[in-house]
Amino acid sequence: MGGGVGELRKYKVVIAYDGTAYSGWQYQENAVGIQQVVEDALAYLDGAPVRVYGSSRTDAGVHAKGFVAHFHLTKPIPAKNLVRAMNARLPDAIRVLKASYAKEDFDARLSAKGKEYRYQLYQADILPPHLAPYWTFCHRPLDLAAMKKAASYFVGKHDFVSFAANPDRVLETTVRSVFSFEVKKAGPRYTFIVRGDGFLYKQVRSMVGFLLSVGKGNERPEAVKELLSAASPRTARVETAPSRGLFLWKVFYSNAGLTCTRK
C-alpha cells in the first residue's frame, strides 16, 4: 500500500445522499444508482475504472447521512484532498463528508458491526412541501405509547422473516439482532431510530409500517411478539412504509453503542 503512481491505495469515505431521484445504491443496467455516479466521479479522478463497495444496498428513494464505502485508486491522491475532488465531480444530491486511508483488510460491508437507520414521519393535516422528499405523511393521530411498547418487542435476537420482503437472493439465515428501537416525537414529527447488527430486505420499513398500524389502533403492541414467535413468511398484515422517510444514519465498526436496550 505504498501510494506511488500505479500502486493501489485503499480509501474509506463517508457519503450523504438524497436518494429521491436514484434507484438505490447498487448499480443497475436500466436505472441510475448512486454507486454508478460515485464510480464515474472516481474514474474521472483516477483516469481508470474504479469499483466502489458500499456498506449497504439501500432501496430506491432511500436516503443516507452516513453511508460508508471503500475503493482503490492508482493515483496518489491525498485523502485530505479527496473530499473536495469528489464533490466537484458529484451532483448536489450526493456529498462526500469524510475520506481517509483504509487498511487492506477493511471492508465497508463485512467489517461493519452494526447500522443505525432512522425513519421520519410527519403527522398533521398538511405536510409542508419542503419536507415532502424526506418525511412520510400521516394525517391520522398516532398512539405514541403503544408504538413505543411495540418497538421494544423488536429488541433482541429474533427470526425477522415475518418483517422482510422477498428479496431476489438466498439467505443463510433470517435471524438478526436489534440492539435498540426508539420512537421519538417532537410536535408533528415522529422519528423511529433502530440499531441492529444487520437488516433483511425492507425489514426496517416493514417494522415501521407495523408500528404505524399499532399507532393507528389497527394492531396491538403484543402482535409484534406473536409475529416474531411464529417466524412465518410475511403476509399482507405487515405493510411496508414508504421509502422516502428512511435514512441510513450511521454504520458502526466497533461494538460501542450496540448493546441491547429497551426504552
Where are each of the predicted segments found?
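Structured-RNA-binding interfaces characteristic of tRNA pseudouridine synthases
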Residues: 2-263
